[in-house]
């Protein structure tokens, strides 16, 4: 058997990025083993054919049942609780990277690699995720929940490249058709509107939730909506209500099946509470003078400060304008391009009292 330190398991989707990952690592002298996780939809024929062309071992892991029972179920449950989930953030630690580690151990691979546009950096004994060089493709936001034990076995070959450079590389290597392929920006298990997906997976949802009321911030009923799971904080389009001025979703109350509407100014926040955090070094995070947080994928980093509350939650104070704080989304903390950690945005109910209790925090 070859030296395992040069044997790497690559998560192969059959797409542009995983194909380039395999080729780049081959050029660097690694022995490549490919595994394709079938989690939804058709057989991964592209990945099989690419592996055969590259002359690498290839396996298919049929994970449709556990994927549906964990990631898809969580996605549905979050909307049923009035939250806005990001399934990639859940999938990476609970499913994708966990499965890659298990397969790597089974196949004698010390390393795992994926086509994520991110980098890794070791500093002070810790491994940090660093934003990829292509700002349009950077995926560091989705990786904050990965633990140190996983990161120490990861290789992200595409972190220093732009998407166009990767396409050019594949073209040069003779993979012209692959280099010209398009790519989907959708959630991998949803084609189209997530609301249709919820109805398809939960035929009882409409009857269970039923229509509810749009209300103003004063509690005045403004009109009926189709059910709280079909809305998200900050939403303006698709509300199907005419108020004579732009209206945005401010709050969602699952218990009362109400959706509060208001103007853009009412979406602004000075603080937020976050939970279930994963921080690389807490002392560094809390003392960081240049800390910034992203509260949505592709959103601009917002300068902030963070402190730990007595109940274990994080209190985040924004130092610049922040808007549309959506429970269920991720708050990812950066110093420059380096990820210091992240957390899930919690329910903001009762935040006024939390702010009052921490009014002396500077």
Swiss-Prot record:
Major subcellular site: cytoplasm
Molecular functions per Gene Ontology: ATP binding; tRNA binding; tRNA-uridine 2-sulfurtransferase activity
Site for Interaction with tRNA, residues: 116, 329
InterPro entries per the UniProt record, alphabetical: MnmA-like, MnmA-like_C, MnmA-like_central, MnmA-like_central_sf, Rossmann-like_a/b/a_fold
Highest taxon above the source species: Bacteria
CC per GO annotation: cytoplasm
Protein's name in the database: tRNA-specific 2-thiouridylase MnmA 3
Organism from which the protein derives: Bacteroides fragilis (strain YCH46)
Gene name as annotated: mnmA3
């Amino acid at each position: 058997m070859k030296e395992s330190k040069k044997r790497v398991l690559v998560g192969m989707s059959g797409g542009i990025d995983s194909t380039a990952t395999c080729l780049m690592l081959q050029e660097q002298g690694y022995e490549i083993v490919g595994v394709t996780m079938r989690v939804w939809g058709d057989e991964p024929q592209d990945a099989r054919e690419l592996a055969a062309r590259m002359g690498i071992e290839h396996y298919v892991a049929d994970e449709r049942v556990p994927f549906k029972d964990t990631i898809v179920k969580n996605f549905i449950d979050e909307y049923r609780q009035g939250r806005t989930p990001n399934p990639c953030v859940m999938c990476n630690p609970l499913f994708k990277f966990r499965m890659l580690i298990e397969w790597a151990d089974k196949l004698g691979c010390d390393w795992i690699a994926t086509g994520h546009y991110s980098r890794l950096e070791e500093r002070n004994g810790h491994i940090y995720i660093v934003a990829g060089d292509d700002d349009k493709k950077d995926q560091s936001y989705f990786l904050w929940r990965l633990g140190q034990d996983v990161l120490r076995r990861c290789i992200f070959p595409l972190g220093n490249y732009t998407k166009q450079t990767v396409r050019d590389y594949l073209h040069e290597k003779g993979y012209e058709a692959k280099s010209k392929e398009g790519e989907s920006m959708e959630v991998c298990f949803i084609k189209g509107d997530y609301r249709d997906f919820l109805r398809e997976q939960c035929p009882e949802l409409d009857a269970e939730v039923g229509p509810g009321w749009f209300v103003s911030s004063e509690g005045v009923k403004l009109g009926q909506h189709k059910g709280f799971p079909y809305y998200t904080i900050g939403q303006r389009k698709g509300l199907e209500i005419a108020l004579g001025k732009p209206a945005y979703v401010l709050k969602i109350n699952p218990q009362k099946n109400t959706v509060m509407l208001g103007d853009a100014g009412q979406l602004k926040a000075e603080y937020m509470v976050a939970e279930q955090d994963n921080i690389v070094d807490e002392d560094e995070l809390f003392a960081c003078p240049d800390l910034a947080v992203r509260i949505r994928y592709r959103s601009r980093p917002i300068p902030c400060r963070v402190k730990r509350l007595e109940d274990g939650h994080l209190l985040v104070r924004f130092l610049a304008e922040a808007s549309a704080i959506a429970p269920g989304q991720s708050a990812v903390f950066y110093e420059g391009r380096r990820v210091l950690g992240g957390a899930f945005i919690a329910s903001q109910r009762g935040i006024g009292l939390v702010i009052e209790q921490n009014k002396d925090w500077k």
